[in-house]
Amino acid sequence: MSSRLKIVTIGPFPPLRGGISDFHESLVAQLSKKNDVSVLNFKSLYPKILFPGKSQYTEYKNTSDSVETILNPLNILSWFKGSHFIKKKNPDKLIISYWSFFFIPIYMFLLGSIKKGHRYVLFHNVISHENRIFEKFFLKLFIKKIDRCIVMNKYNEKLILQINPKA
């Protein structure tokens, strides 16, 4: 009997550029050593008009069969494709990379694809750098839907507990 867990991770992954994408790639490499990991990646993160840099992409070509690049936060049809992917994989754990409340709608939708007790969110930033109006309200709703919050420092832990003391 295998003790390997089936894990689906959701978040930016190369060829999308940026620190969170690079972190996600490293996380998947480590988790894959002892687990069966599939990645649900974004086709794009933001509309071109909102993207602050030259390009969202690097020259990196991902050759992994475990990466499914279908999500677009502004295309609801991609949300259904992502949900289907999660249900088909039937993972033991779902790990979402969170860094901006812009992604809360798609993430809340995708959380409905897996039963409670298996929903983990890795918070890179609890409060986005822009600190938008209503951000804490939506974060509170989001945190209620997840089973485990993973933070990288005490500051983010404190923010999560201020938003939802039961987290």
Task: Name these PLM-found stretches.
Residues 93-95, 111-129:
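Active-site proximal beta-strand in glycosyltransferases
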Residues 115, 126-145:
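Nucleotide-sugar donor phosphate/pyrophosphate-binding loop at the beta->alpha transition
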Residues 67-73, 81-105, 118-120, 148:
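Short N-terminal targeting/anchoring amphipathic segment
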Residues 19-30, 106, 134, 138:
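Conserved alpha-helical elements of sugar-nucleotide-dependent glycosyltransferases
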Residues 146-167:
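A short, active-site helix/loop in glycosyltransferases that binds the activated sugar's phosphate group
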Residues 13-17, 29-86, 156, 161:
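N-terminal strand-loop element at the rim of the active site
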Residues 11-25, 47, 99-104:
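A short, glycine/small-residue-rich beta-strand->loop->alpha-helix junction that serves as a flexible
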